[in-house]
């Protein structure tokens, strides 16, 4: 019986996807207890062929690929939720790798807390070319979104929510919240996001607790291309666009503007 599903959205990153899958197939759960659903979001590279070859080389791992034509990661994640066969669904992205106990950690968490609906795990930044000497935690936050809140299961700290590349849900508890907003989220390589924060905000407003599960570890792989001034300026601009879109959706633009200015001012002081 499939007890937990893992969903990986992907768009034109076949090589990175295969690297992510290499870590997925090493999960320490019995193979008949989990599945992995890759959602190819309008990929035009060799994603389908490379996935098929990888799946053929790893029979019995419950790997399958579905195509989603709706543009953007929100459409892909919503498709993954619909396709998942298990009552529990975890998400990672295609530029990551996970520990062998990733799915087990989430499975054991939800089984011991039957009222829990949402959780997120530890995120570690990984730099294949080495961590730059100039990197600070304030620059690393928007680029890699690292998270480490200790060694015990606990609610997420106030003001923090899971990263979209390491989150898990109990499907039965999501019915009243809808899915990820398709007007938010990255499309065709653009850096506009905010769909995860929007979803988590709805869950919090609904009275849910977001739990931190330290045993679900994800390494976010940061290539040299994401360590340039041009990339950081583009990312910073699109973070602002994402915040504005979310503020307009929730009709709180003035409050959001003041809060974001305060946060950026604090990072400059610190």
Would you name each region that the model predicts?
Residues 121, 138-160:
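Short, flexible, basic/aromatic active-site loop/helix in glycosyltransferases
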Residues 164-178, 183-217:
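A short, conserved alpha-helix in the catalytic core of glycosyltransferases
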């Amino acid at each position: 019986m499939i007890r937990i599903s893992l969903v990986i959205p992907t768009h034109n990153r076949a090589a990175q996807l295969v690297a992510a899958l290499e870590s997925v197939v090493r999960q320490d759960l019995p193979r008949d207890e989990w599945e992995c659903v890759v959602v190819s979001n309008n990929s035009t590279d060799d994603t389908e062929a490379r996935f098929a070859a990888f799946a053929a080389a790893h029979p019995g791992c419950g790997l399958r690929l579905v195509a989603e034509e709706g543009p953007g990661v929100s459409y892909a994640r919503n498709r993954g939720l619909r396709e998942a066969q298990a009552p529990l669904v975890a998400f990672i992205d295609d530029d990551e790798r996970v520990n062998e106990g990733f799915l087990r950690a989430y499975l054991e968490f939800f089984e011991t807390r039957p009222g829990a609906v949402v959780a997120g795990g530890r995120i570690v930044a990984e730099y294949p070319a080495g961590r730059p000497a100039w990197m600070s935690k304030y620059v690393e936050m928007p680029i890699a979104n690292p998270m480490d809140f200790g060694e015990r299961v606990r609610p997420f700290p106030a003001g923090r929510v899971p990263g979209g590349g390491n989150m898990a849900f109990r499907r039965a508890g999501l019915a009243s919240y809808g899915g990820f907003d398709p007007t938010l989220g990255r499309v065709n390589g653009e850096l506009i996001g905010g769909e995860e924060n929007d979803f988590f905000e709805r869950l919090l407003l609904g009275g849910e607790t977001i739990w931190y599960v330290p045993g679900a570890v994800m390494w976010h792989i940061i290539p040299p291309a994401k360590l340039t001034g041009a990339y950081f300026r583009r990312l910073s601009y699109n973070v602002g666009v994402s915040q504005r879109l979310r503020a307009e959706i929730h009709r709180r633009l003035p409050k959001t503007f003041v809060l974001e200015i305060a946060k950026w001012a604090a990072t400059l002081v610190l």
